């Protein structure tokens, strides 16, 4: 069995194939040579979020099987906005904003695939390089003539927008399918790209690209979609009460990222291990079986958090996340670095900025809502339930001082076992 056949079987076993065109032909096509595939990532923000992890990791899986991945960053399509299954029209951003996002996303994508000199070395491409070179007349004549509006409005992704009362769809967004389809034809011609992958919401755009490539280039190409990740409780994957989980450590810290995966529900964890890690399906099945047979805390969440944090933030990011987690649990903060505390300030703990040079602990507890009243704050202190930077506070008249802050900037207040507030001295 070839590496490619093993890959396709593995993708199926992981539940990573939603739809596929001509699956038997695709398997044969991939098994005969190093093939080039691509996935597009439109810059809708200055960072990718964890919703992009599945396609990024599938690009990596294909590369490991000997194929050449192209990560397309949509410098052109990002200026338009994909209407697929969106309730309303996206806000249009300026060329400068999108251009800046393109550069940041290029750097992020580069962390997931290998840019070797080998035949299957990865590349990052920007569709502004070819879409920006074609004028309107050429586009209408060479691309537009191959599309039937009758067929386009029957695409489920477009149909939902047209049928939604008070919404509709602009010609700008309606034309998105043509641009994405042209990407496939352009990459097929320039890079001999024969496979496009994407989320299952991209099926209409991908099949449009397959048809356009056949018409323009007279070439047979393929499409494969990946399932959109859902949670068993019906809530949206990748969102928390505090917002989106980003891949950029300046937007979501490695610690918060690690904690997100650690909080995965038992009903989701083994599915997520199949989607987001490179553990074999047999290894994942063994973890699941072990968790079922052993009473107490399951191992699945810890394995998932470690594997995905290592993939996105490297060994250093994982070590930091585990160090912070252990320190907060034990109450011993002596191992924390200034960078660790900056992570907690970003999104790890509720935080309060202090401008005064000192403040009583009682005031600190009530202001941070760790105590509902001064009386209750004193009771907590008297019961030994309050600590500052890992040291128990016994005196109800104790004062929090900037000179005692960690690295001259941070004071970690803990009440009980799990309630924290981070004071940041200005």
From Swiss-Prot:
Enzyme Commission number(s): 6.1.1.1
Motif annotated as 'KMSKS' region, chain positions: 236-240
SUPFAM superfamilies assigned to the protein according to its UniProt record, in alphabetical order: Alpha-L RNA-binding motif (SSF55174), Nucleotidylyl transferase (SSF52374)
Biological-process GO terms, alphabetical: tyrosyl-tRNA aminoacylation
Keyword Cell division: no
InterPro entries membership: aa-tRNA-synth_Ic, Rossmann-like_a/b/a_fold, S4_RNA-bd_sf, SYY-like_C, Tyr-tRNA-ligase, Tyr-tRNA-ligase_bac-type, Tyr-tRNA-ligase_bac_1
Enzyme class: ligase
Function in brief: Catalyzes the attachment of tyrosine to tRNA(Tyr) in a two-step reaction: tyrosine is first activated by ATP to form Tyr-AMP and then transferred to the acceptor end of tRNA(Tyr).
Name of this protein: Tyrosine--tRNA ligase
Organism of this sequence: Aliivibrio fischeri (strain ATCC 700601 / ES114)
Gene: tyrS
């Amino acid at each position: 069995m070839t590496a490619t056949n093993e890959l396709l079987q593995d993708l199926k076993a992981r539940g990573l194939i939603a739809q596929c065109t001509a699956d038997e032909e695709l398997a044969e096509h991939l098994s005969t040579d190093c093939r080039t595939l691509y996935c597009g990532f439109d810059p809708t923000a200055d960072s990718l979020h964890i919703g992009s992890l599945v396609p990024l990791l599938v690009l990596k899986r294909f590369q490991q099987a000997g194929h050449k991945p192209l990560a397309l960053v949509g410098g052109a399509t990002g200026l338009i906005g994909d209407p697929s299954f969106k309730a309303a029209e996206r806000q249009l951003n300026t060329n400068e904003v999108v251009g800046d996002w393109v550069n940041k996303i290029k750097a992020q994508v580069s962390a997931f695939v290998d840019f070797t000199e080998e035949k299957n070395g990865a590349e990052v491409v920007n569709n502004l390089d070819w879409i920006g070179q074609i004028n309107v007349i050429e586009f209408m004549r060479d691309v537009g003539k191959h599309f039937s509006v009758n067929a386009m409005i029957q695409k489920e992704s477009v149909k939902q927008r047209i049928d939604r009362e008070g919404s509709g769809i602009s010609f700008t967004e309606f034309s998105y399918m043509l641009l994405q389809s042209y990407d496939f034809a352009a990459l097929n011609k320039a890079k001999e790209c024969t496979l496009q992958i994407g989320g299952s919401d991209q099926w209409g755009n991908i099949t449009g690209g397959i048809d356009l490539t056949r018409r323009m280039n007279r070439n047979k190409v393929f499409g494969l979609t990946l399932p959109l990740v859902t949670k068993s409780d019906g809530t949206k994957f990748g969102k928390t009460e505090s917002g989106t989980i980003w891949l950029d450590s300046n937007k979501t810290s490695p610690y918060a990222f690690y904690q997100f995966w650690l909080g995965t529900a038992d009903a989701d964890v083994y599915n997520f291990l199949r989607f987001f890690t490179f553990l074999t399906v047999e290894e994942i099945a063994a973890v699941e079986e072990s968790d079922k047979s052993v009473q107490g805390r399951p191992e699945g969440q810890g394995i998932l958090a470690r594997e995905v944090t290592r993939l996105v933030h490297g060994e250093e990011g994982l070590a930091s996340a585990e160090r912070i987690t252990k320190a907060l649990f034990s109450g011993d903060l002596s191992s924390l670095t200034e960078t660790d505390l900056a992570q907690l300030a970003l999104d790890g703990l509720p935080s309060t900025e202090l401008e005064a040079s000192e403040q009583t602990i009682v005031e600190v507890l009530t202001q941070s809502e760790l105590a509902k009243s001064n009386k209750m704050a004193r009771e907590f202190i008297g019961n030994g339930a309050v600590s500052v930077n890992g040291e128990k506070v016994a005196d109800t008249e104790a004062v929090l001082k900037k000179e005692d802050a960690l690295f001259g900037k941070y004071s970690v207040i803990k009440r009980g076992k799990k309630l924290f507030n981070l004071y940041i001295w200005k």
